């Protein structure tokens, strides 16, 4: 057999084996986890009381394409129920239209975001969700997914962390481009996480049940 013939056979064998080797190397690579989270260290939580915000909130619900600009406080410093009711309406479930009274602490945090980022409009990605899965803070009207145009979500995430004196959850969603902020049940530790999954990634449809357990309190009705 000539040297040229041998060289051609060797080259052919290398070309055939190359794709197989590449496929094996790809299989060996570990898949990157979409989610990572941990309890927040107590040493990282806020130790000083939060100053009272201005009360101003400019909020737009992305799915509903509605927005409001209100002050959650009356001139005497008490809560303005009519303003809270307008925000409750904006926080309503986009799928069912159900409305619940959202935790006022969440609205105070919204006002702090408004104050910190120079009065920019806050976009609400998700508020109250009328779902059967009652482990979600959205179900209990104590969570929100937000973003602000022109502000990086990392900056929003860091600011949200600075507001946590205990009992808050703060999540970063780089793929979807928003942060999650919630208030936890009494005694629950603060939690931090990053979720790289995109919209509707891995979500399963939940069957609706005819019987439902206790839910969050009814929505507030405007008083003025």
For each predicted feature, which ranges?
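N-terminal secretory targeting signals
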Residues: 1-53, 198-224
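Catalytic cores and adjacent binding grooves of peptidoglycan-active enzymes
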Residues: 26-27, 60, 135-144, 148-224
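Envelope-exposed proteins and targeting segments
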Residues: 53-55, 83, 87, 118-120, ...
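Second-shell loop/turn segments in exported
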Residues: 55, 91-103, 143-147, 189
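Structured segments of extracytoplasmic/periplasmic soluble domains
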Residues: 60-62, 90, 109-120, 149, ...
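Short, surface-exposed glycine/acidic/tryptophan-bearing loops
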Residues: 81, 125-143
């Amino acid at each position: 057999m000539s040297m040229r013939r041998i060289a051609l056979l060797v080259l052919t064998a290398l070309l055939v084996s190359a794709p197989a080797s590449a496929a094996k190397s790809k299989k060996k690579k570990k898949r990157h986890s979409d989610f990572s989270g941990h309890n927040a260290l107590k040493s990282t939580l806020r130790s000083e009381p939060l100053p009272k915000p201005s009360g101003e909130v400019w909020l737009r619900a992305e799915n509903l394409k509605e927005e409001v600009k209100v002050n959650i406080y009356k001139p005497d410093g008490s809560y303005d129920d009519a303003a809270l009711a307008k925000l409750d309406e904006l926080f309503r479930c986009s799928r069912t239209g159900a409305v619940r009274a959202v935790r006022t602490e969440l609205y105070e945090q919204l006002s702090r975001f408004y104050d910190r980022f120079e009065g920019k409009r806050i976009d609400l990605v998700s508020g109250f969700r009328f779902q059967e899965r009652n482990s979600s803070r959205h179900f209990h009207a104590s969570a929100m997914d937000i973003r602000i145009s022109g502000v990086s979500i990392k900056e929003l995430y860091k600011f949200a962390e600075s507001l946590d004196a205990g009992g808050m959850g703060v999540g970063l969603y780089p793929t979807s481009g928003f942060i999650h902020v919630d208030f936890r049940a009494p005694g629950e530790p603060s939690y931090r996480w990053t979720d790289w999954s995109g919209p509707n990634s891995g979500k399963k449809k939940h069957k609706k049940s005819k019987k439902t357990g206790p839910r969050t309190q009814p929505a507030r009705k405007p008083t003025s």
